[in-house]
From Swiss-Prot:
Swiss-Prot/TrEMBL site (Involved in substrate discrimination) positions: Y150
Tissue and organ expression note: Predominantly expressed in petal limbs and tubes of corollas.
One GO-annotated biological process of the protein: response to ethylene
Name recorded for this polypeptide: S-adenosyl-L-methionine:benzoic acid/salicylic acid carboxyl methyltransferase 1
Species whose genome carries this gene: Petunia hybrida
Length: 357
C-alpha cells in the first residue's frame, strides 16, 4: 500500500464525506485560535509584509479549510489597521496528497470569498489561492517563499506504513499486545518523517517565518496508551468480528496497519531541537471529546461517521468496499458501548515555531 496514493479524506458532500463529518477537527481549529493569532500577530508586526504567503498543509476540504483562511485574514486585518497600513496581498497555498478532493474545495471558493467580504468588507487583500498536491514530507515550495505555515490534524499521518511490523497480529495500529519491535518501528518512522518535514519547511520559510502545527498526540509517555490508540483498537475489534463471521480473512487484518503516530510533547520537542532550524514559542496539549456534537444520544453514530470519513479510503485500499457499511455499523455499536462506560477524548499536541535563520 503506497500511502501517498490512498491516504485522503472522503471527498464530496455526501453522508460519509469529510466535509460533513469533521466537527472534531473544527473544534480543534477553534481551540487553537489563540496560539495561531499570537503567532500571526508576531509575524506581521515584525515584518509588515506587503505580500503574505501562507501554506495550509494537509488542508483536506470543506468548511474547516476556509475557517483557517478566515481566521488568518481577520487576524492580519485587525493588526494592520492598528498600525495604519494598507492590507497586504494574501497568497494561500492549499496542500494535500493528490487523492484529496481539490475539485470540491475550489468549487466552494467563490461562495467563501463572497461571505468573507460580507463579514469584513471589501478593503482587504486581494486574496490568491493555489492547490499544491504532494507530500509535505518532500519539498513543496521555492526557497524562502513562505511567511506562515499552518497544519491541523495532519502531521500524525506517516509517509508510509513502518517497515518490520508484520508480526503485529490482530492489531491495525500500536496496541498493548504489539511487540516492542512494532512500537520502535512506528517511532522510527515518525522521527524520520517529522525531521524531514522540519528540514523542508526550514528551506521554504523565510527568516522569522512562523509555523503553528496541531496533531493528534498523547500526554502519556506510553505510545500504546489508550488516550491515543483506543480509537483504532475499537476499529480492529470491528474488523475481527467480521473475521469471526467469515467475511474477512484473518491474514487480511493481520496485514493491515494504520500509517499514523501520535507523539507526546516530549517527543515533538526532542525532534524539533535535534533538527535545529526552529525555536519553540509554545508547546501545549488540549483535549476534545470523541463526540464533538452536542447530541449525546447519537455519540457512537457521530464518532463512527467521523472515523469513516477519515479512514474509509485506507480501508477500501485493502478490504472489500462492499463491507464498509457493515464494518462501520459494528464499529458504531462497539464505540457506543465504550462511550457509555468511559470518558473518551482525543489529545491534541499544539506547537508554535519560529524559523531561526
Amino acid at each position: 500500500m503506497e500511502v501517498v496514493e490512498v491516504l485522503h479524506m472522503n471527498g464530496g458532500n455526501g453522508d460519509s464525506s469529510y466535509a460533513n463529518n469533521s466537527l472534531v477537527q473544527q473544534k480543534v481549529i477553534l481551540m487553537t485560535k489563540p496560539i495561531t493569532e499570537q503567532a500571526m500577530i508576531d509575524l506581521y508586526s515584525s515584518l509588515f509584509p506587503e505580500t503574505l504567503c501562507i501554506a495550509d498543509l494537509g488542508c483536506s476540504l470543506g468548511a474547516n479549510t476556509f475557517l483557517v483562511v478566515s481566521q488568518l485574514v481577520k487576524i492580519v486585518e485587525k493588526e494592520r489597521k492598528k498600525h495604519g497600513f494598507k492590507s497586504p496581498e494574501f497568497y494561500f497555498h492549499f496542500n494535500d496528497l493528490p487523492g484529496n478532493d481539490f475539485n470540491t474545495l475550489f468549487q466552494s471558493l467563490g461562495a467563501f470569498q463572497e461571505d468573507l467580504r460580507k463579514h469584513i468588507g471589501e478593503s482587504f487583500g486581494p486574496c490568491f489561492f493555489s492547490g499544491v498536491p504532494g507530500s509535505f514530507y518532500t519539498r513543496l515550495f521555492p526557497s524562502k517563499s513562505l511567511h506562515f505555515v499552518y497544519s491541523s490534524y495532519s502531521l500524525m499521518w506517516l509517509s508510509q506504513v513502518p517497515n518490520g511490523i508484520e508480526n503485529n497480529k490482530g492489531n491495525i495500529y500500536m496496541a498493548r499486545t504489539s511487540p516492542l519491535s512494532v512500537i520502535k518501528a512506528y517511532y522510527k518512522q515518525y522521527e524520520i518523517d517529522f525531521s524531514n518535514f522540519l528540514k523542508y519547511r526550514s528551506e521554504e520559510l523565510m527568516k522569522g517565518g512562523k509555523m503553528v502545527l496541531t496533531l493528534l498526540g498523547r500526554e502519556s509517555e506510553d505510545p500504546t496508551s489508550k488516550e491515543c490508540c483506543y480509537i483504532w483498537e475499537l476499529l480492529a475489534m470491528a474488523l475481527n468480528k467480521l473475521v469471526e463471521e467469515g467475511l474477512i480473512k484473518e491474514e487480511k487484518v493481520d496485514a493491515f496497519n494504520i500509517p499514523q503516530y501520535t507523539p507526546s510533547p516530549a517527543e515533538v520537542k526532542y525532534i524539533v531541537e535535534k533538527e535545529g532550524s526552529f525555536t519553540i514559542n509554545r508547546l501545549e496539549t488540549s483535549r476534545v471529546h470523541w463526540n464533538a456534537s452536542n447530541n449525546e444520544k447519537n455519540g457512537g453514530y457521530n464518532v463512527s461517521r467521523c472515523m469513516r470519513a477519515v479512514a474509509e479510503p485506507l480501508l477500501v485500499s485493502h478490504f472489500d468496499k462492499e463491507l464498509m457499511d457493515l464494518v462501520f455499523h459494528k464499529y458504531e455499536e462497539i464505540v457506543s458501548d465504550c462511550m457509555s462506560k468511559e470518558n473518551t477524548e482525543f489529545i491534541n499536541v499544539i506547537i508554535s515555531l519560529t524559523k531561526i535563520n
